[in-house]
Amino acid sequence: MKALHFGAGNIGRGFIGKLLADAGIQLTFADVNQVVLDALNARHSYQVHVVGETEQVDTVSGVDAVSSIGDDVVDLIAQVDLVTTAVGPVVLERIAPAIAKGLVKRKEQGNESPLNIIACENMVRGTTQLKGHVMNALPEDAKAWVEEHVGFVDSAVDRIVPPSASATNDPLEVTVETFSEWIVDKTQFKGTLPNIPGMELTDNLMAFVERKLFTLNTGHAITAYLGKLAGHQTIRDAILDEKIRAVVKGAMEESGAVLIKRYGFDADKHAAYIQKILGRFENPYLKDDVERVGRQPLRKLSAGDRLIKPLLGTLEYGLPHKNLIEGIAAAMHFRSEDDPQAQELAALIADKGPQAALAQISGLDANNEVVSEAVTAYKAMQ
């Protein structure tokens, strides 16, 4: 089996690329970073530090790389069995034209073996969005052929991969946590379902997408925002602060009550999942900076994201949300010189006041009681 993976960054190399290569799949990375491309093509291998209770070093081998903006990537799409991405939500639109060209070439070459495309991004139904961009870039006479022969498979991914702090200055070395979860929608595949260790198949993807969003992402963000306010540097330092831990755990329990109502998750198993995530935040090997985790607060405070979406769920089912409100208030305080969204957030609050600003960012009605609750909590933090 041959695969092409867009994005040779830390997540691409440390998570999806590693799973594919470990499964014995012939893997080519596509990226724009020439230093990384040259290193991959010179060595055909790289090291991954897997850290949890213990630390181990795995070697990923048998890989190569191409530029994601050249002809090679188009040729590969015409040949491979699987295309995956870990490029970030914003970049999906940029890689779509190359994918479209490759699919046209595949059709012209008469290659009718099934191709499946899986976007492995920190977003809901990212592959469906990528499919929209690809379809827009395709000529009309190729669209029906693509619908018939190409599967666009949505997935949920979860693995903490902090920015590399390689002591060796090796551009390929990467550190990842032991935990990883890659759940894919088995109803969207074309052809035979793949058997890749570490890839879980489900016919109820949204339950797992929201479980991750409402637990890991919600908890991670609130830990970062409260941690930054309290002067902590890392996620570990923040979650070891008992006051912060109580709010984070409380928020995950509040969002968890929504998941249990909505999808019928087992309450005891979900409580264990929350404990596992708190343990991941404590990982001493992951030097995960609160500023990195907190960045892009406007996106994280938007209606479909990790803070407001679970809050809306608590309103839908008439459930408590005190800790989620604390997290939202802390997010409104997030300031970072390196993050344009943090600066935009500050300007919006200064211009409109916290109530109107939060309403605009979140899509909530300014007169909604929860907006007032968040503003009260926000002011109490000043």
Swiss-Prot record:
Record-listed E.C. numbers: 1.1.1.17
Pfam family, one: Mannitol_dh_C
GO molecular function, one term: mannitol-1-phosphate 5-dehydrogenase activity
Cellular component per GO, a single term: cytosol
Biological-process GO terms, alphabetical: mannitol catabolic process
Keyword Ribonucleoprotein attached: no
Catalyzed chemical reaction(s): D-mannitol 1-phosphate + NAD(+) = beta-D-fructose 6-phosphate + NADH + H(+)
Keywords annotated in UniProt: Acetylation, NAD, Oxidoreductase
Family matches, as Gene3D superfamilies: N-(1-d-carboxylethyl)-l-norvaline Dehydrogenase, domain 2, NAD(P)-binding Rossmann-like Domain
Classification via PANTHER family: ALTRONATE OXIDOREDUCTASE-RELATED, MANNITOL-1-PHOSPHATE 5-DEHYDROGENASE
Family, per entry: Belongs to the mannitol dehydrogenase family.
Protein name: Mannitol-1-phosphate 5-dehydrogenase
Taxonomic source organism: Escherichia coli O127:H6 (strain E2348/69 / EPEC)
